[in-house]
Amino acid sequence: FQLVNLLRDKNLSFDDPKIIAKTGWTTGELIEAVEKEGVSAVFDLVTLLVGVNNQYRGLSKEEYKAEFGHLLDTAIAFAGGKREHVYVLSIPDWGVTNFAVANGKNAKIVAEEIDAFNNINREEAMYKHVGYIDITAGSRELGKKAVMLAQDGLHPSAEMYAEWASSIANEIVLTGNFNV
């Protein structure tokens, strides 16, 4: 909702968002949910951010690539085939969070794995000619600050989501892909 409100503040007209994904899902779980939801509408804007739980659970990069590609095709269909209305967001790095530290996770290894998954989603976004927004660098910088994390010390807070929403809104305005 933060993103749509920011875009509305920039005189862009958007309907209220439909959010399908839930925190904690893998690509496979998101595919199942999309199919179960039976969404057939066309949306002005579609964003896709998924994969951190594939990495966290140790799922294969090959599986991620196949499932992410399927989800990206679905996102493009949800945008009525308008690839310029689809944005992939990179996976944030949870390895810098209090949760990771408290659970003895090696931040360097987590970062390397997150980067590998992000290489996949970036390549898929480029191949399918959709927008790509890197939020990983910001998550590494800001994820150490308690205010940027929910009380569990792992998930993003409203403040972190606001940072991401601002980045996305600025990118959308810069591209000029939406009418004012």
Where are these regions (language model features)?
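Conserved SGNH/GDSL esterase-like catalytic core that processes O-acyl groups on lipids
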Residues: 1-73, 80
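A structural motif corresponding to the C-terminal end of an alpha-helix
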Residues: 7-10, 74-86, 120-133
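Secondary-structure boundary motif
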Residues: 9, 36-40, 77-81, 126-127, ...
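Residue-level recognition of beta-strand->loop/alpha-helix junctions
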Residues: 18-21, 90, 134-137
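A generic "cationic amphipathic patch" detector
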Residues: 30-33, 56-59, 77, 99, ...
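Alpha/beta-hydrolase-fold catalytic nucleophile elbow
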Residues: 49, 89-90
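Catalytic His-Asp segment of secreted/periplasmic serine-dependent ester chemistry enzymes
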Residues: 93-180
